[in-house]
A protein has these predicted regions:
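Cross-family detector of peptidyl-prolyl cis-trans isomerase
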Residues: 1-126
Length: 126
């Protein structure tokens, strides 16, 4: 993997006002200057995920003290569509409606039917 040592800290996700979006919303919080992630790439990231409606955190690699590595094509659609184009060193927020996350309510996952907000730091691509 091509990457860098991150000196960033765990992001705080501010509560979101208004109605949940119906499409994926991608916002670059910091633009990186390293290698660019492509569709299906293997990536190394730190992330925080919260529920759009409640603001409650449901997961964070930061809390486990280690980033995670994985191929994008095995992840939720919001990550598959929202990480390509991001550059190493960048921080991006994704707001993923259910069809970009874990599907409609009753889909078998505890987060099915929920709009999710992720802040992702791209540490490496390979």
């Amino acid at each position: 993997m091509t990457g860098l040592i991150s000196n960033k800290t765990k992001p705080e996700i501010e509560p979101t006002l208004g109605d949940a979006p119906t499409e994926l919303v991608i916002t670059d919080l910091e633009v990186g200057d390293g290698a660019e992630a492509t569709a299906g790439a293997n990536v190394d990231v730190h992330y925080v995920g919260v529920d759009f409606e409640t603001g409650e955190q449901f997961d964070a690699s930061w809390d486990r003290g280690a980033s995670i590595q994985f191929p994008l094509n095995g992840l939720i659609k919001g990550w598959q569509d929202g990480i390509p184009g991001m550059k190493v060193g960048g921080r991006r927020q994704l707001i993923c409606p259910p069809q970009y996350a874990y599907g409609p309510a009753g889909g078998g996952h505890r987060l099915s039917g929920r709009t999710l907000v992720f802040v992702i730091d791209l540490l490496a691509v390979g």
